[in-house]
Amino acid sequence: MNNSDISMSLANPHPANYNTLQKIGLAVIALGVLSLALAWVGIGSHQALLLLLSTLLGLGIGGLIFFYGTYGHLPEGIKNNRAFFSSISSRGALGWMLGIVLTGFYVSLYFFPEYMSGLTNMFEPLSQALRGTPSSQWFVYGTFYTVAVLVMGIKFIMKYRHSRYQVLRTISVSFFQLIFAWLLPAIMVRLYNYEPYLTYFWPLDYDAIFPSNIKYILSNGRLGQFVVVWGLVLTFIGTPVLTYFFGKRWYCSWVCGCGGLAETAGDPFRHLSDKSLRAWKIERVLIHSILGIILIMTALLLVDSAAKGGLLG
């Protein structure tokens, strides 16, 4: 007898049963999304602080409530239940919608920042309090980025709390994102009108040792001198030594903001990545090609600077 259940239903015949905490969390998240949408279209611009608090607290606290309701009552151990069947993490309707929203957000961020004026205005109170400068689309992006790493990092810890390594790694990458990539640069802008990123150095920051960039950094006095020396030490001493002993994971999984977002917010989607040998070969070619271009470009500019423009004019 064939026991397979072949359903013709347009709806999910076996929906996930959400408990009370999960439903409360989803409701709070929905309020945060509503506040975000109102701010984006410019509604309630005179209540920027209220919209900001309701957005960040709604998304943050709502997410934590939902994740605690999901993992808090379960025993320790890897839990990837329904990852291949969830609409949002298996190329379903919610996944496509999320992809379109995120793509639209990035297009607006880089090419049409004027369409983000509502969000920029919402973050004005926080930017003035923290940085002492007007808000910008990059401050909006950095704040959302940091909130995503922190909230999804706590979720990751709940999910992988049986692994001490994963817990420590997540705490580390969340710390570097919050302190070194968001809070410290903001404080430095307020104190010195300069925004250093101490975890971002050459060749990852490809123009970090361009002559014109070094000249600009050194114009910021002793802070600039420290940043230049710090970057050179990390590039030519710290990175080779740490990579020799630990591989690239010391940076990509423990320090880097990109890796932080991938390991936290990207965790539910990691099964979608191409794990074929062909994909790995393409990745190697791209990485080494880009590194080669950066090396050549940097060397040409340094030689040209030493020759006082005699090479490139």
Go through each PLM region and give its residues.
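Non-ligating segments of multi-cofactor redox enzymes
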Residues: 2-313
